[in-house]
Amino acid sequence: MKIGIMTFHWAQNYGAVLQCYALKCKLEELGHDVWIIDRLPRYEGILRRLYHRFSYKYFLSWMRFAHFNHSFLVPKTRKYHSTKELEKHFGKEKFDMVIVGSDQVWRWNILGYNYFLDFVDKRYTRKVSYAASFGMSHWEENGLDTFKIAELLKEFSRVSVREQTGVGICQHTFGIHAELVIDPTMLHDASFYEKTLLKEYEKTDEAKMVSCILGKEHKGHCLQLSNWAWKRSLAYEELYWTSWDFFHMEFCKGSFYHISVSEWLNEIRNASYVVTNSFHCAVFAILFHKQFVVLNNHSGGGDRIRTLLTALHLEDCFSSSLDDRILSQLLHEPIPYEKVEKRLGVLRESSLAFLKTL
C-alpha cells in the first residue's frame, strides 16, 4: 500500500523526529510504500527567519534537524501550509491509507482538525491512527468542537492511542473503540538504532550521568545533579531537548545544546545513569538498558510515561521529586532488564499485530 504519515516531522525535537523515523521504517519493513505528509505550520517560515537572524545557536540546531529530515524522513509529499492547500491538492497524492501519529497530534486546541484528517476523503483513502495522543488526561469539553471531532474520528478504520487515558477519552467522549499501543520508537530494539543512526559513532564505557530535564525545573535539577555526580567521580552531561529550550535556558557546564539526533542518541547509549522528565529520553534509556529515573514533568504529559512504566513493571523508576534517596536508588538497585525485555516483547508484538492487520 501507499501510506502517508501525518505527524510532527518538522519539529526541532528529538522525540518527534525519531518517532516519525521509527514508524516509517517499520511500515517499510512490512512492505509498504511510505511517504511523509509535509504539512508545515504557517508560522514556521517567519519564526525560522527571525531566529536565523538573531540566534546562531538556533541556526546550528536548525541545521542539525534539517539534515536529519532531509536524510531520513523521505520521501515527502509537496509542502502544505494550510487546510485550503490540503483540500485542493491532497487527493492527487492517491494514498491508500493515511496514518496519523504518533505524538500529541490530537491537541485540537493548538493544532486544529488537520491531524484528525479532515482533508482526507474516506471514500478513497483509509484513515488510521497509530499511538496518537490527546496531550491531556481528560477531555476539555468544547461543545461544537467535540461534536466535529467525534464525527471525524468515526471515519477512521482503526484507532490506536499511546496512553491509557486516551483509550478512555475515545470511549467516553467520542464513543469509539481505541487500542493501546506502544510508541513507534519502541517497535524497534536497540540494535536497530545502532545499525542505522549510530553506526558511525563509538560506544564507550565511561562512568557518566546524563540528564534531560524539560521545563522550569531544569536549572535547579541540573546544578543538583552536577554536584552529586562530581562527588562520586562521575562525568556529567546535560542534554537539551528542543531549540526552544536552549534559546531560553541558562546552561550548566557541560551542556550539549546543538548536537545532532544521532549524537543525542549516542549520549544516552554511552551513559551509565540517566535522569529525565522526557518521555522519549526515558524510552531510549530503557532500550539501551540504562539505570534511570523519570521525574514528574509538572508542565504535563505524565500519563504517557506512567502508562509505559506500569506496563513494564518499572513504577519504581518514577519519582515526583529529586533527592539523594532517589539518586542512591539509581546507583544501587539494578533494573532487571531481562524481565523488562520479555514484557516489552509482548507489547511490541501486540503493537506490530495492529500494523500488520491494517
Ranges and model annotations:
Residues 1-358:
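Active-site anion-handling motifs in enzyme catalytic cores
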